[in-house]
Amino acid sequence: MPGVRERPDGRHVRGRDPGGNTDIPGAVIGKIAARAVGEVPGARSSRSRAARIRVSGEIVLLRLRIDVDYPLPVRRVAGAVREHVKSRVERITGKQVNHIDIEISELVR
């Protein structure tokens, strides 16, 4: 497989390794992101469609739906989620997360 190829729909990420290509499906990146959300105090992934992923080469763009514990400051929790998810996805996949949109779907007690 010479070169690095990717699907036009952006659902897979291919990276060149010395021994061959590593293919990371967008669904896997989404699961990594969803788990990382749950590691942030006061946040959890929304039950419905927790993550949308767009991949372009080595660049990952995420849109996350999260629930935030009431009465925590929503912007502070969202900022912590953004920082932690970026770090976790980049560390595990080796890809660069350029942008994370966060939608607050619910405040929970």
Language model segments and positions:
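Generic hydrophobic secondary-structure packing signal
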Residues: 29-33, 62, 74
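Residues at secondary-structure transition points
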Residues: 23-28, 69-76, 80
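Peripheral (non-transmembrane) domains and long loops of multi-pass membrane proteins
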Residues: 26-27, 61, 101
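Terminal low-complexity, intrinsically disordered regions
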Residues: 1-44, 109
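Short, hydrophobic beta-strand segments
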Residues: 13-20, 60-68
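Short edge beta-strands and adjacent turn/loop segments
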Residues: 40-67, 105-109
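A short amphipathic beta-strand at an alpha->beta junction
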Residues: 91-109
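Short, non-transmembrane amphipathic alpha-helical segments
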Residues: 74-93, 97
